[in-house]
Amino acid sequence: MGLQLRALLGAFGRWTLRLGPRPSCSPRMAGNAEPPPAGAACPQDRRSCSGRAGGDRVWEDGEHPAKKLKSGGDEERREKPPKRKIVLLMAYSGKGYHGMQRNVGSSQFKTIEDDLVSALVRSGCIPENHGEDMRKMSFQRCARTDKGVSAAGQVVSLKVWLIDDILEKINSHLPSHIRILGLKRVTGGFNSKNRCDARTYCYLLPTFAFAHKDRDVQDETYRLSAETLQQVNRLLACYKGTHNFHNFTSQKGPQDPSACRYILEMYCEEPFVREGLEFAVIRVKGQSFMMHQIRKMVGLVVAIVKGYAPESVLERSWGTEKVDVPKAPGLGLVLERVHFEKYNQRFGNDGLHEPLDWAQEEGKVAAFKEEHIYPTIIGTERDERSMAQWLSTLPIHNFSATALTAGGTGAKVPSPLEGSEGDGDTD
């Protein structure tokens, strides 16, 4: 009988049985140890249960502990509001960052998303484990800007808890050169990258980049003439339409269909003077861009205007042959705006969702560019002279060469001057 009793007590773990009407507090005995005397107090870390006829167990507090834990968890989950799908309008200066996209598990190269995720967690918008696995919050960015590239109109989509004063709380945990400028609710399946119809980038550069090589001037005295500006815009307009840009990126051959991209517009605005140095802004709008593409588009036009390359190189660069296309510095590149025309047509006026046009935020976007992006680009250019250093490499390029691709038409020969950082939003 003693062995059977001990077996029963062991089966019920920490809760002890009361057999019959007499209460008992008999913990499981080891070996031949004597049970505690009658009336001894039960240890405080033990709970007892009472038995009823038929062997039913009745817990003294009236409820099975497992059920209590389960109902408590349900109650806690009910207290948390459901996450909602939103988009955030972001602006940031890319100097000092290794691009936009986060590299989970790597702290060596800091990215914009590292600071963003930290701010989302600290403000209470997402749980901490969502920062470790961004798929849990359905995170997606419109464009994957790379090392040193800034943005005035980046848009990311994600699921968050819509806490009170959400923008103020997120921004309070961000450095001043990263700002969330707007927030809108979107459909549950919205993906900022896939829903984006087009991207607009701008490239800020000193106008002495267009000075002819025979009278090259790289100081504050140079001013862009109307004739040269007209020539620049004529060449930039040649990019409009669909072309094969395999020579404007890396690791893509002429037979790769993804190398064909559609450019809606590209032009250079009137120059302006900052801190005694004249600058101009080149704007380009396209459905999507590959890594290095915009910088190489700018670089080739600069090489033509300066007299290093013939205009015919533009047409050749879209053909199947390998063409040496120079890549302008990344400092002046800025993601200015992303476009959602098709989404706005379908959902923008359905009475449930707002159109993603950000018209009310344009003032804040312009102010951020004037305060953080343009001063950083202009100041860095004056201090480091990245454009002047790059211009000195143009004579090294051989624009008349017509080398065939190695290993057949599907492989691309990498340029010896090609670096690792660039611009790209789809590849």
Swiss-Prot record:
The active site is at residue 146. Residues 44-79 have a biased composition (Basic and acidic residues). Widely expressed. High levels of expression found in brain and skeletal muscle. The keyword Ligase does not apply. GO terms for molecular function: chromatin binding; pseudouridine synthase activity; RNA binding; steroid receptor RNA activator RNA binding; transcription coactivator activity; tRNA binding; tRNA pseudouridine(38-40) synthase activity. InterPro entries: PsdUridine_synth_cat_dom_sf, PsdUridine_synth_TruA, PsdUridine_synth_TruA_a/b_dom, PsdUridine_synth_TruA_C, PUS1/PUS2-like, TruA/RsuA/RluB/E/F_N. The modification Phosphothreonine is found at residue 426. It comes from the Eukaryota. It catalyses: a uridine in tRNA = a pseudouridine in tRNA; uridine(38/39/40) in tRNA = pseudouridine(38/39/40) in tRNA; a uridine in mRNA = a pseudouridine in mRNA. Keywords: Cytoplasm, Disease variant, Isomerase, Mitochondrion, mRNA processing, mRNA splicing, Nucleus, Phosphoprotein, Primary mitochondrial disease, Transit peptide, tRNA processing. It is linked to Myopathy with lactic acidosis and sideroblastic anemia 1: A rare oxidative phosphorylation disorder specific to skeletal muscle and bone marrow. Affected individuals manifest progressive muscle weakness, exercise intolerance, lactic acidosis, sideroblastic anemia and delayed growth. This is Pseudouridylate synthase 1 homolog. It comes from Homo sapiens. The lineage of its organism: Eukaryota, Metazoa, Chordata, Craniata, Vertebrata.
